[in-house]
Amino acid sequence: SITKIKAREIL
């Protein structure tokens, strides 16, 4: 999922 990866990047 891209959303999970994006959330990881933000955090």
Swiss-Prot record:
Q: List the disulfide bonds.
A: none
Cofactor list: Mg(2+)
Location relative to the cell: Cytoplasm
- Gene Ontology MF annotations: metal ion binding; phosphopyruvate hydratase activity
Q: Which UniProt keywords apply?
A: Allergen, Cytoplasm, Glycolysis, Lyase, Magnesium, Metal-binding
Q: What class of enzyme is it?
A: lyase
What does the record give as the function of this protein? Answer: Glycolytic enzyme that catalyzes the conversion of 2-phosphoglycerate to phosphoenolpyruvate.
The record describes its quaternary structure and partners as: Dimer.
Q: Which family does it belong to?
A: Belongs to the enolase family.
Q: What is this protein called?
A: Beta-enolase
